[in-house]
């Protein structure tokens, strides 16, 4: 018999439902993919350093991280980054590089179609 444990964080459960509904309404598969990754256990969430974002993102691009952005490394370009959480050092380094930190909810409101968004994990 397998154990099923539901998420206890109300922000996270509401976000998952919102992502699934938006995916269905706008036929945007990217939001369903993000919702699926957030339904996994917390230990499987992405932890992405700024050095990886700097390596794979281009200037002016929008990146989504289904997990936490960490502040290790340097960011030399301005990118929009949406994530579940940010470390304090990551937030300050992104702002110093003229980038933008946002929650997944904010990105969902700004871009419900999900066009031009890349997932990093």
Curated annotation (Swiss-Prot):
Keyword Magnesium belongs to the record: no
Annotated signal sequence range: none
Keyword field contains Ribosomal protein: yes
This protein's GO CC annotations: cytosolic large ribosomal subunit
SUPFAM superfamilies given in the database record: Ribosomal proteins L15p and L18e
InterPro entries xref list: Ribosomal_eL18 (IPR000039), Ribosomal_eL18_arc (IPR022947), Ribosomal_uL15/eL18 (IPR021131), Ribosomal_uL15/eL18_sf (IPR036227)
MF annotations from Gene Ontology: RNA binding; structural constituent of ribosome
UniProt record, GO biological process: translation
Keyword vocabulary terms for this entry: Ribonucleoprotein, Ribosomal protein
Residue intervals passing through the bilayer: none
Cystine pairs: none
Similarity section: Belongs to the eukaryotic ribosomal protein eL18 family.
Protein name: Large ribosomal subunit protein eL18
Species of origin: Methanoregula boonei (strain DSM 21154 / JCM 14090 / 6A8)
Gene: rpl18e
